[in-house]
Amino acid sequence: MRGTLPRRGRPGRSPAAARRRALSLLAALAGLLAALVVALPQTSAVAAIPGESNGGVRIMPLGDSITDGYTPYPGGYRVTLWQDLAGAGHLVDFVGSQTNGPAELGDHDHEGHPGWRIDQLDANIVGWLNATDPRTILLHIGTNDINQDDDVADAPARLSTLIDHILRTKPDVQLFVARIITEQGEPHATMVNTYNAAIPDIVASKGPNVHLVDMHAALTADDLADGVHPKQEGYDKMAAVWDSALESVPASLQPLPATPAPASAN
Protein backbone atom coordinates (compact mmCIF):
# COMPACT_ATOMS: atom_id res chain seq x y z
CA MET A 1 0.00 0.00 0.00
CA ARG A 2 1.45 3.25 -1.10
CA GLY A 3 1.88 5.93 1.49
CA THR A 4 0.39 9.34 0.85
CA LEU A 5 3.13 11.78 0.07
CA PRO A 6 2.92 15.24 1.64
CA ARG A 7 1.84 17.94 -0.80
CA ARG A 8 4.49 20.36 -1.83
CA GLY A 9 3.94 23.97 -2.81
CA ARG A 10 4.78 25.03 -6.29
CA PRO A 11 8.25 26.45 -6.79
CA GLY A 12 8.29 30.19 -6.08
CA ARG A 13 4.96 30.11 -4.20
CA SER A 14 6.15 30.51 -0.63
CA PRO A 15 3.66 32.19 1.72
CA ALA A 16 5.68 35.41 1.63
CA ALA A 17 5.71 35.42 -2.17
CA ALA A 18 1.97 34.79 -2.27
CA ARG A 19 1.35 37.73 0.03
CA ARG A 20 3.50 39.98 -2.13
CA ARG A 21 1.60 38.90 -5.23
CA ALA A 22 -1.75 39.56 -3.55
CA LEU A 23 -0.65 42.99 -2.44
CA SER A 24 0.53 43.82 -5.95
CA LEU A 25 -2.83 42.80 -7.39
CA LEU A 26 -4.68 44.89 -4.82
CA ALA A 27 -2.53 47.92 -5.57
CA ALA A 28 -3.18 47.54 -9.29
CA LEU A 29 -6.91 47.23 -8.68
CA ALA A 30 -6.91 50.33 -6.47
CA GLY A 31 -5.12 52.31 -9.17
CA LEU A 32 -7.67 51.21 -11.76
CA LEU A 33 -10.58 52.22 -9.55
CA ALA A 34 -9.02 55.62 -8.86
CA ALA A 35 -8.60 56.22 -12.57
CA LEU A 36 -12.23 55.31 -13.18
CA VAL A 37 -13.45 57.70 -10.47
CA VAL A 38 -11.45 60.58 -11.92
CA ALA A 39 -12.78 59.83 -15.38
CA LEU A 40 -16.42 59.78 -14.29
CA PRO A 41 -18.38 63.04 -14.76
CA GLN A 42 -19.14 64.97 -11.57
CA THR A 43 -22.53 64.45 -10.02
CA SER A 44 -24.77 67.38 -9.19
CA ALA A 45 -23.77 67.08 -5.53
CA VAL A 46 -20.13 67.95 -6.21
CA ALA A 47 -20.22 69.78 -9.52
CA ALA A 48 -19.37 73.47 -9.58
CA ILE A 49 -22.46 75.61 -9.14
CA PRO A 50 -22.96 78.32 -11.79
CA GLY A 51 -22.81 81.78 -10.28
CA GLU A 52 -20.46 80.97 -7.41
CA SER A 53 -17.59 83.46 -7.20
CA ASN A 54 -18.64 85.04 -10.47
CA GLY A 55 -16.61 88.22 -10.08
CA GLY A 56 -19.63 90.32 -9.09
CA VAL A 57 -19.96 92.74 -6.21
CA ARG A 58 -19.25 90.76 -3.04
CA ILE A 59 -22.16 90.69 -0.59
CA MET A 60 -21.90 88.87 2.75
CA PRO A 61 -25.18 87.67 4.31
CA LEU A 62 -24.20 87.64 8.01
CA GLY A 63 -26.11 86.28 10.98
CA ASP A 64 -27.58 83.13 12.50
CA SER A 65 -29.99 80.41 11.33
CA ILE A 66 -32.34 83.02 9.86
CA THR A 67 -29.53 83.96 7.46
CA ASP A 68 -28.59 80.32 6.92
CA GLY A 69 -32.21 79.63 6.01
CA TYR A 70 -33.45 77.23 8.62
CA THR A 71 -36.26 74.88 7.61
CA PRO A 72 -38.87 74.81 6.20
CA TYR A 73 -37.10 76.81 3.47
CA PRO A 74 -33.36 76.08 3.17
CA GLY A 75 -31.52 79.10 1.84
CA GLY A 76 -33.99 81.48 3.46
CA TYR A 77 -34.17 85.03 2.17
CA ARG A 78 -30.99 84.52 0.15
CA VAL A 79 -32.86 82.61 -2.56
CA THR A 80 -35.33 85.33 -3.52
CA LEU A 81 -32.82 88.12 -2.90
CA TRP A 82 -30.35 86.56 -5.32
CA GLN A 83 -33.06 86.10 -7.92
CA ASP A 84 -34.32 89.67 -7.52
CA LEU A 85 -30.84 91.17 -7.80
CA ALA A 86 -29.93 89.04 -10.81
CA GLY A 87 -33.27 89.83 -12.43
CA ALA A 88 -32.55 93.54 -12.05
CA GLY A 89 -29.25 93.10 -13.87
CA HIS A 90 -26.92 93.25 -10.86
CA LEU A 91 -23.86 91.01 -10.91
CA VAL A 92 -23.36 90.00 -7.28
CA ASP A 93 -21.25 87.40 -5.54
CA PHE A 94 -22.53 86.18 -2.18
CA VAL A 95 -19.51 85.41 0.02
CA GLY A 96 -18.83 83.57 3.27
CA SER A 97 -17.38 80.40 4.74
CA GLN A 98 -20.75 78.60 4.75
CA THR A 99 -22.55 77.21 1.72
CA ASN A 100 -26.01 75.72 1.39
CA GLY A 101 -29.34 76.20 -0.29
CA PRO A 102 -31.49 74.85 -3.13
CA ALA A 103 -30.63 74.73 -6.82
CA GLU A 104 -32.63 77.89 -7.56
CA LEU A 105 -30.22 79.86 -5.37
CA GLY A 106 -27.56 81.10 -7.77
CA ASP A 107 -24.83 81.54 -5.15
CA HIS A 108 -24.82 79.50 -1.95
CA ASP A 109 -22.07 81.25 0.06
CA HIS A 110 -22.92 83.08 3.29
CA GLU A 111 -22.02 83.60 6.96
CA GLY A 112 -25.22 82.39 8.60
CA HIS A 113 -24.43 80.26 11.67
CA PRO A 114 -27.36 78.47 13.36
CA GLY A 115 -27.56 79.08 17.09
CA TRP A 116 -24.89 81.77 17.13
CA ARG A 117 -25.01 84.95 19.20
CA ILE A 118 -23.50 88.37 18.60
CA ASP A 119 -20.32 87.57 20.53
CA GLN A 120 -19.69 84.45 18.43
CA LEU A 121 -19.88 86.42 15.20
CA ASP A 122 -17.61 89.04 16.74
CA ALA A 123 -14.99 86.42 17.64
CA ASN A 124 -14.70 85.39 13.98
CA ILE A 125 -15.58 88.45 11.95
CA VAL A 126 -12.08 89.77 11.27
CA GLY A 127 -10.93 86.48 9.75
CA TRP A 128 -14.05 86.20 7.60
CA LEU A 129 -13.70 89.75 6.33
CA ASN A 130 -10.05 89.30 5.45
CA ALA A 131 -10.81 86.02 3.68
CA THR A 132 -13.70 87.27 1.53
CA ASP A 133 -13.28 91.08 1.32
CA PRO A 134 -16.99 91.94 1.03
CA ARG A 135 -18.14 95.22 -0.47
CA THR A 136 -21.50 94.97 1.32
CA ILE A 137 -22.74 93.18 4.46
CA LEU A 138 -26.32 92.28 5.42
CA LEU A 139 -26.41 91.81 9.22
CA HIS A 140 -29.33 90.24 11.08
CA ILE A 141 -28.26 89.10 14.55
CA GLY A 142 -29.48 89.05 18.14
CA THR A 143 -32.20 86.38 18.13
CA ASN A 144 -30.07 83.81 19.94
CA ASP A 145 -28.87 86.31 22.53
CA ILE A 146 -32.54 86.60 23.44
CA ASN A 147 -33.45 82.92 23.15
CA GLN A 148 -30.41 81.87 25.19
CA ASP A 149 -31.01 84.68 27.70
CA ASP A 150 -27.40 85.75 27.27
CA ASP A 151 -27.16 89.06 29.15
CA VAL A 152 -29.82 90.53 26.88
CA ALA A 153 -29.51 93.99 28.41
CA ASP A 154 -25.94 94.17 27.10
CA ALA A 155 -26.79 92.82 23.62
CA PRO A 156 -26.97 96.30 22.01
CA ALA A 157 -23.48 97.07 23.32
CA ARG A 158 -22.20 93.81 21.85
CA LEU A 159 -23.80 94.71 18.53
CA SER A 160 -22.07 98.09 18.63
CA THR A 161 -18.72 96.41 19.24
CA LEU A 162 -19.29 94.00 16.35
CA ILE A 163 -20.03 96.92 14.04
CA ASP A 164 -16.87 98.69 15.21
CA HIS A 165 -14.77 95.63 14.41
CA ILE A 166 -16.33 95.37 10.96
CA LEU A 167 -15.61 99.03 10.18
CA ARG A 168 -12.11 98.87 11.60
CA THR A 169 -11.30 95.91 9.35
CA LYS A 170 -13.16 97.12 6.25
CA PRO A 171 -13.69 100.88 6.59
CA ASP A 172 -15.21 101.23 3.12
CA VAL A 173 -17.77 98.44 3.47
CA GLN A 174 -21.48 99.22 3.09
CA LEU A 175 -23.07 97.70 6.20
CA PHE A 176 -26.83 97.15 6.52
CA VAL A 177 -27.96 96.42 10.09
CA ALA A 178 -31.43 94.98 10.63
CA ARG A 179 -33.87 95.47 13.43
CA ILE A 180 -34.50 91.76 13.88
CA ILE A 181 -37.75 89.98 13.12
CA THR A 182 -40.27 89.25 15.84
CA GLU A 183 -40.80 86.06 17.81
CA GLN A 184 -43.99 84.37 18.93
CA GLY A 185 -44.84 84.45 22.61
CA GLU A 186 -43.65 86.24 25.69
CA PRO A 187 -41.29 87.28 27.05
CA HIS A 188 -39.29 86.93 23.83
CA ALA A 189 -41.46 89.20 21.68
CA THR A 190 -41.03 92.03 24.18
CA MET A 191 -37.30 91.33 24.50
CA VAL A 192 -36.98 91.63 20.72
CA ASN A 193 -38.73 95.00 20.85
CA THR A 194 -36.43 96.24 23.60
CA TYR A 195 -33.31 95.14 21.72
CA ASN A 196 -34.54 96.64 18.46
CA ALA A 197 -35.28 99.98 20.12
CA ALA A 198 -31.56 100.49 20.74
CA ILE A 199 -30.41 99.75 17.20
CA PRO A 200 -31.29 103.03 15.41
CA ASP A 201 -29.08 105.12 17.69
CA ILE A 202 -26.23 102.62 17.34
CA VAL A 203 -26.45 102.72 13.55
CA ALA A 204 -26.69 106.52 13.47
CA SER A 205 -23.46 106.79 15.45
CA LYS A 206 -21.40 104.67 13.05
CA GLY A 207 -21.11 106.94 10.03
CA PRO A 208 -22.55 107.21 6.52
CA ASN A 209 -21.71 103.68 5.39
CA VAL A 210 -23.88 102.00 8.06
CA HIS A 211 -27.58 101.76 7.24
CA LEU A 212 -30.61 100.82 9.34
CA VAL A 213 -32.99 98.21 7.89
CA ASP A 214 -36.36 97.81 9.61
CA MET A 215 -36.85 94.09 9.10
CA HIS A 216 -39.04 93.90 12.20
CA ALA A 217 -41.78 95.95 10.55
CA ALA A 218 -41.94 93.65 7.54
CA LEU A 219 -42.93 90.41 9.29
CA THR A 220 -45.52 89.47 11.88
CA ALA A 221 -45.81 86.39 14.06
CA ASP A 222 -48.05 84.89 11.37
CA ASP A 223 -45.02 84.80 9.04
CA LEU A 224 -43.15 82.41 11.35
CA ALA A 225 -43.03 78.65 10.88
CA ASP A 226 -41.98 77.69 14.40
CA GLY A 227 -42.19 80.87 16.43
CA VAL A 228 -38.65 81.94 15.48
CA HIS A 229 -37.87 81.14 11.82
CA PRO A 230 -39.94 82.44 8.91
CA LYS A 231 -42.05 80.43 6.54
CA GLN A 232 -41.10 80.71 2.87
CA GLU A 233 -43.44 83.67 2.50
CA GLY A 234 -41.73 85.34 5.45
CA TYR A 235 -38.30 84.82 3.94
CA ASP A 236 -39.59 86.33 0.70
CA LYS A 237 -40.65 89.42 2.65
CA MET A 238 -37.16 89.65 4.14
CA ALA A 239 -35.65 89.42 0.66
CA ALA A 240 -37.81 92.30 -0.52
CA VAL A 241 -36.68 94.47 2.39
CA TRP A 242 -33.00 93.71 1.80
CA ASP A 243 -33.42 94.33 -1.93
CA SER A 244 -35.06 97.70 -1.34
CA ALA A 245 -32.32 98.69 1.11
CA LEU A 246 -29.57 97.75 -1.34
CA GLU A 247 -31.22 99.58 -4.22
CA SER A 248 -31.51 102.71 -2.05
CA VAL A 249 -27.72 102.78 -1.65
CA PRO A 250 -26.30 102.43 -5.18
CA ALA A 251 -22.74 102.13 -3.88
CA SER A 252 -23.67 98.86 -2.16
CA LEU A 253 -24.18 97.23 -5.55
CA GLN A 254 -21.13 98.74 -7.20
CA PRO A 255 -17.48 97.73 -6.87
CA LEU A 256 -15.31 99.88 -4.67
CA PRO A 257 -13.64 102.49 -6.91
CA ALA A 258 -10.07 101.61 -7.66
CA THR A 259 -7.45 103.70 -5.89
CA PRO A 260 -5.25 105.48 -8.45
CA ALA A 261 -1.66 104.35 -8.39
CA PRO A 262 0.75 107.03 -7.13
CA ALA A 263 2.58 108.86 -9.88
CA SER A 264 6.14 107.71 -10.31
CA ALA A 265 8.91 110.25 -9.80
CA ASN A 266 10.88 111.24 -12.88
Regions found by a protein language model. Give the residues of each.
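Active-site segments of SGNH/GDSL-like serine hydrolases
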Residues: H140-N144, D164-T194, H216
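Solvent-exposed loop/turn segments at secondary-structure junctions
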Residues: S65-G69, G76, Q98-E104, G142-Q148, ...
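Generic structural signal for well-ordered alpha-helices
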Residues: I125, L159-D164, N196, P200
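Conserved SGNH/GDSL esterase-like catalytic core that processes O-acyl groups on lipids
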Residues: R58-M60, I66-A157, T190-T194
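N-terminal module-boundary/linker segments of secreted carbohydrate-active enzymes
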Residues: A48-R78, E247, A251, P257
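Secretory targeting and sorting signals
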Residues: R2-A48
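Loop/turn elements at helix/coil->beta-strand transitions in domains of secreted/extracellular proteins
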Residues: G55-I59, A88-D93, T132-L138, K170-F176, ...
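Extracellular serine-dependent O-acyl
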Residues: Q174-R179, M191-A225, Y235-A258
